[in-house]
């Protein structure tokens, strides 16, 4: 008997069934999604309470503000990475069975797992941003939207990275260990501690390829490096003139003597390397990492098989 097609169903039919299956699975797994929403709620209230009424115009206040974004970025990213590993690993068994019977193409599994994450990531990040953003004193509707979108892209990037490890490695435990080790290296080279300017030249290449540092740079530059026109320094009076209302335009108070006079924007860009002009290039790089992780996830689904014979 000869068959003209490898699979009985068309690609359109496969797509409909697999995408619906993933959407139903996510909807019927409240422990996964409610955990993300609960952590987003707790983190936003925690940071909002601690930094309520904070003054970011001082040297100590600005460093604390960047540290707040660093910790918030890290916690949101780690939540996305860790929580997706069990659900991705458990579904792999069904995928192996159905691939053996040629029920569905691996591409539609990849497509379904990609689509199912998007609404939940954007919704949980919106909850976080809606509470956190005004409570810590950040302003601006456009800045709010960009902050939410880029935080969501960070969540997608780490979620897809987790799926990639779950598909590529033999077990959930191995994926978790390897992922934590790699993310630990990323944390060191995100540009906050140590700051970008203090990273030794021999390790600059690690800083330049760390995915998390692009997201942190975007979020920090949005709120601390936004200044359309820097104020001018009056050398005679030793004061800044023509100071605009944006946070990035404000003079940095109580800065160390070796730093001298500077603004919030200049300090953020010079010390932490988080430049406002790089927001859009960095966003493209984050999207590039998302695509890269999805490609590796697809290749893992297609060519790797960790079943025990």
List each language-model region with its residue ranges.
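Short, membrane-interfacial amphipathic segments enriched in basic
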Residues: 1-17, 204-211, 309
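Aromatic- and glycine-rich beta-strand/loop motifs that create alpha-glucan
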Residues: 4-38
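Membrane-spanning alpha-helical segments of multipass transporters and channels
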Residues: 24-309
């Amino acid at each position: 008997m000869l068959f003209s097609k490898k699979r009985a169903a068309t690609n359109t039919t496969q797509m409909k069934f697999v995408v619906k299956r993933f959407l139903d699975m996510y909807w019927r797994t409240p422990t996964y999604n409610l955990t993300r929403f609960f952590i987003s709620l707790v983190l936003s209230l925690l940071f909002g309470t601690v930094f309520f009424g904070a003054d970011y115009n001082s040297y100590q206040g600005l460093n604390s503000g960047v540290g707040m974004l660093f910790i918030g970025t890290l916690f949101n990213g780690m939540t996305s990475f860790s929580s997706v590993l069990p659900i991705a690993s458990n579904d792999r068994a069904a995928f192996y069975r159905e691939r053996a019977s040629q029920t569905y193409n691996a591409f539609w599994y990849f497509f379904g797992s990609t689509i199912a994450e998007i609404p939940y990531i954007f919704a949980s990040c919106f909850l976080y941003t809606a509470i956190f953003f005004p409570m810590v004193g950040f302003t601006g509707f456009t800045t709010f939207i960009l902050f939410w979108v880029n935080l969501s892209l960070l969540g997608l990037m780490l979620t897809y990275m987790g799926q990639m490890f779950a598909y590529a490695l033999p077990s959930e435990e191995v994926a978790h260990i390897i992922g934590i080790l790699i993310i630990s290296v990323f944390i060191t080279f995100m540009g906050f501690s140590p700051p970008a300017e203090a990273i030794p030249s021999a390790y600059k290449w690690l800083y330049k390829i760390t995915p998390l540092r692009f997201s942190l740079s975007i979020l920090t530059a949005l709120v601390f490096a936004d200044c359309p026109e820097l104020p001018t320094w009056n050398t005679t009076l030793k004061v800044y003139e023509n100071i605009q209302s944006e946070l990035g335009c404000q003079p940095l108070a109580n800065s160390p003597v070796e730093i001298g006079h500077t603004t919030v924007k200049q300090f953020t860009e010079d010390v932490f390397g988080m430049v406002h002009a790089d927001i859009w290039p960095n966003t493209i790089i984050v999207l590039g990492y998302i695509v890269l992780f999805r490609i590796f996830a697809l290749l893992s689904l297609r060519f790797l098989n960790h079943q025990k014979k």
